[in-house]
């Protein structure tokens, strides 16, 4: 992602006549939508990195579709973080799901995933631990004030809608 944004920044300098809309999208949730993140929510317990809140931000599929339409049409150029208001730490997500959290030290998770992936027991590797440990919390202020779109659903509402649709 960083490399792509650097290339886009270079293009803005070398071709200022071109407009760009860069969307940094949080985790997308919608009815019937399943991905690597939602896979984690279907498990018996949620895994957390000890000492990290592992906050999640979500955007509802309907909101994302509206944002994409605006970006392709009359929306302004710029860089925008796309997510609903608020962030949910993994413990709040677990509470909403009625599931326990197993918090493990980062080194234990890295070691376990380093063994599990080569054995075909996990699709995730040790590099995923940093992703859980340092999840980005996007600020959607520019999306609302500059881009002109306020998501209909907050991160919490989006998660609730997805959870209900997923039967959890």
PLM regions: where:
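Amphipathic terminal alpha-helices
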Residues: 142-145, 150-168
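NAD(P)-dependent short-chain dehydrogenase/reductase
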Residues: 11-61
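Glycine/proline-rich active-site loop of Rossmann-fold NAD(P)-dependent oxidoreductases
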Residues: 2, 16-18, 29-39, 70-80, ...
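Mid/C-terminal beta-alpha module of Rossmann-like enzyme folds, strongest
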Residues: 67-124, 140, 159-163
